[in-house]
Amino acid sequence: LRFFKNLVVNSYLAGTAEPGVTEDNFAGRISAGWRDGLWDVSAFYKEVGDQFNPEVGFIKRKGIRHGYATLGAHPPVEMKWFYKLNPYSEIHYVTDLNSMMVTRTGSAALDFHLRDGGTLGVKAVSRFEKVDTPFSIGEDVTVDAGSYSFGEVIGFFRSNASLPFFTYVRFYSGTYFAGKKRTVSLNLAGRIGYRLTAQVSSNFNDIVYDNKNISANVYGIRVNYSHTTTIHSSAYVQYNSVSDEMVSNLRFNLIHSPLSDLFFVYLDRRYANSGESIDQAVVLKVTKLFNL
């Protein structure tokens, strides 16, 4: 819904049905945003029940209440190398269904919009995570249950995406739970005509935890093809060096009306060395925008 030209309100309510499940099987979200030539202000509230089970992987975390707010500005400037600044801040606040905080992420950033079409930026991030179940981040290295406060600084450069070849580079440096982490993310993309785009990505993570050095790298290849202005298909393959997992994703997208889509997705996850299948899925998703 749009009000006063610049105010946009969105919401959804979804539920799942399974034998024996009668409560906590809904998910809902409401958001509002004000966007004009200078200001960008938005917020949302989302709640996902413990028993909400869409079976399609569109929900990252269940049993939570998630609040989010951001405030940003886009003042024009007259400088030799850039024409606009974008200072902004964000906060995510996540609790369980008993309103006990489990995650908090706050950030402040400044982006420079360059005259050649690129973007340069820096961001400072502060995080809090409550870990209920220990998890592994490498061979013989485990993040124990507990509460952790940590943070990082991120710098990035994105070149002009309208060029035949363009790149996106990010650098991360900071703490990671009870350790330290540095990450370099490299993305190189190319475009052939107006239909075909291909992208190669790599993430190199150097983690120091419990006096142990861990290299956790992720590599990916993505290909997008536009058959028409309303029919698109894509393929994505990702390899994780720590888990030795290969994930493949094939997607077909039909835009059947403005902001309304039909998605057909095939997912495959398996161990790269042995080829053993972990899981597979075929997903059909239909969305429809109603103007009231």
Which residues does each PLM region occupy?
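Aromatic-lined, polymer-binding surfaces characteristic
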Residues: 1
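Exposed, low-structure sequence patches enriched in small/polar residues
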Residues: 4-7, 11-292
